[in-house]
């Protein structure tokens, strides 16, 4: 049985590492003539450079790529096309590294999503299902990621959890 998923409103796609969440999120745009891809990752090492290249080659040329590691609220506001944001947890890591006010940044993001008049799909890692991290920074990241996902899910029209390439609609 093939399920169809509509691209409308704000959609949050959650999943673990290599769960297929980005591939699923991209598939939501297959009926779009054009779309924007907001990348939050920076190519700071060879592994991340290779990961970014894989994502770019998979997407094809209908996408306009915007690179914004920190101020994604402003980037969402400027974009007039359907938009894919990949990924919120890398954005969170960038904010933590810069010691930004996470509550304020998340509130700005949620407001921007509510004000946006085009579909927005956001990809984020679900990191809270494993063991308690050993170090303080990793525990804080896990906790902040959980809070971020909750806040975005609360304003999203739809939420999916992707496991082993299989999307489950939660909301």
Language model features by range: what are they?
Residues 1-12, 38, 160-171:
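Charged, low-complexity C-terminal accessory regions
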Residues 1-8, 82-85, 105-111, 119:
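SAM-dependent methyltransferases
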Residues 4, 10-78:
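Conserved P-loop
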Residues 15-16, 41, 87-88, 124-126:
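Short secondary-structure boundary segments
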Residues 25, 55, 84, 125, ...:
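Residue-level signal for inorganic ion chemistry
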Residues 35, 83, 158-161:
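Short, well-ordered beta-strand core segments
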Residues 57-105:
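Helix-adjacent hinge/juxtasegments
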């Amino acid at each position: 049985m093939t399920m169809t998923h509509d691209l409308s409103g704000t959609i949050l796609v959650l999943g673990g590492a290599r769960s297929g969440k980005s591939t699923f999120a991209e598939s939501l745009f297959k009926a779009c003539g054009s779309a924007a891809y907001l990348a939050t990752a920076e190519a700071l090492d060879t592994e991340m450079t290779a990961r970014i290249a894989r994502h770019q080659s998979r997407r094809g040329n209908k996408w306009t790529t915007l690179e914004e590691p920190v101020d994604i609220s402003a980037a969402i506001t400027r974009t007039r096309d359907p938009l894919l944001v990949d990924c919120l947890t890398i954005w969170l890591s960038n904010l933590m590294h810069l010691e930004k006010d996470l509550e304020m940044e998340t509130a700005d993001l949620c407001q921007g999503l509510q004000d946006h008049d085009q579909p927005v799909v956001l990809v984020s890692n679900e990191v809270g299902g494993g063991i308690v991290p050993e170090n303080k920074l990793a525990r804080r990241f896990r906790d902040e990621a959980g809070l971020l996902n909750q806040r975005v899910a609360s304003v999203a029209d739809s939420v999916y959890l992707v496991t082993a390439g299989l999307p489950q609609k939660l909301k």
